[in-house]
Amino acid sequence: MQIEIKTLDNGSAGTAELPDEIFAATPRADIMARVVHWQLACRRAGTHKVKGMGEVSGTTKKPYRQKGTGNARQGSLRAPQFRTGGAVHGPVVRDHGYDLPKKVRRLGLISALSQKQAEGKLVVIDTAAGMEKTRDLAAKLRALGWRSALIVDGASVDEGFARASRSLLAVDVLPTIGANVYDILNHDVLAITVAGVEALKARLGFGAAEERSAA
């Protein structure tokens, strides 16, 4: 498919060819949900921890004799029914991450890209560079009407541009390798540079070598 290349000044810089296999596929909401759940699970620190009966401080002596007191039998003041007792089946330090097949992750990214294109929220820009001041970048994005935007560049991002965007709320700049389903869906506008489009094609297996073999 053909799409117009925009500039940050809201001008035109020609057209770009986007492969239908990446940007015009049928979005799979179930696959995107699986990938997002996987991403969020992997992001969890897993440092939650409570103390059990064997970890809380206190005596291990039986509080009183088994019979004859009129009270319910007790074996330890560390039991969970007491105020200073340990927790039962509480959270422990662990890794919440799990494996997700590479094909599922790839299909999730393609679905997210196609979803943005179908919604008319996909923009191809000529470059994401030459901007050093946050004030200047904010003015350009405001003129474009981008309140929430994810900008995907090529193999690396321009340091000055990334620094200028760092203080802007709901604006993120990522290299191609960092493009992911969660951030794409979490932003209103997805802006990809020309270099980013080529890098995405290579990352998803639709690079120049495959195009030559198909021809």
UniProtKB/Swiss-Prot annotation:
Q: What's any one GO cellular component for it?
A: ribonucleoprotein complex
Q: Does the keyword Oxidoreductase apply?
A: no
Which InterPro entries does the UniProt entry name for this protein?
Answer: Ribosomal_uL4, Ribosomal_uL4-like, Ribosomal_uL4_dom_sf
Q: Which SUPFAM superfamilies match?
A: Ribosomal protein L4
Q: Which Pfam families match?
A: Ribosomal_L4 (PF00573)
Q: Which keywords fit this entry according to its UniProt record?
A: Ribonucleoprotein, Ribosomal protein, RNA-binding, rRNA-binding
Q: Where is this region: Disordered?
A: 51-88
Q: Give the molecular function GO annotations.
A: rRNA binding; structural constituent of ribosome
Tell me a GO biological process for this protein. translation
HAMAP family from the xrefs? Ribosomal_uL4_B
Subunit arrangement? Part of the 50S ribosomal subunit.
Query: What does the sequence similarity comment in the record state about its family?
Result: Belongs to the universal ribosomal protein uL4 family.
Biological role: One of the primary rRNA binding proteins, this protein initially binds near the 5'-end of the 23S rRNA. It is important during the early stages of 50S assembly. It makes multiple contacts with different domains of the 23S rRNA in the assembled 50S subunit and ribosome. Forms part of the polypeptide exit tunnel.
Q: What is this protein called?
A: Large ribosomal subunit protein uL4
> What's the name of its gene?
rplD
